[in-house]
Amino acid sequence: SAASDVYKRQVQGRLIGGCVDCLVNLLGTTYDKTTGFVEKYKNDGMIWFLESCDLNVMAIRRAVWQMKHAGWFSHVKAFLIGRPAVYGQELMGLDQYHAVWDLLKDYGVPVIMDVDIGHLAPMMPLVCGSYATVQVNGNDISVKMEYL
């Protein structure tokens, strides 16, 4: 039945992420403390949340590629991807979904797209460093954050 085909998933871990436009500019600088945070909480696992404001789909892809190859996604348990400000844009056959999916699918963890985070309303605030339980049921998502 169609009801049994609904995507359902629950995952727990530390929330880390934000606006890709800003994060990629910190990568490799003295302000980049990502690897230390990821290692400190590796037993919890990471739930990365990413969204973009000013980047086009090609720039989003390049930024996520750079984050991936810098080792930021070690110990990842899931990715929450917000709708970018360029929602619906396609450049040379690349859309917002394949810009990230093609790079993140190798981790073998859930990649949840079009999450209500970021620069497009509606937007749900997420607290970096909180311990989260994310539940997905079809198009519905809930995020419970604990401050441990």
Label each PLM-derived region with a short phrase.
Residues 13, 32-33, 66-70:
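Active-site helix-to-loop segments that bind/position phosphate- or nucleotide-bearing substrates
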Residues 13-14, 21, 46-48, 77-80, ...:
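Structural motif
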Residues 15-60:
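Oxyanion-binding "anion nests"
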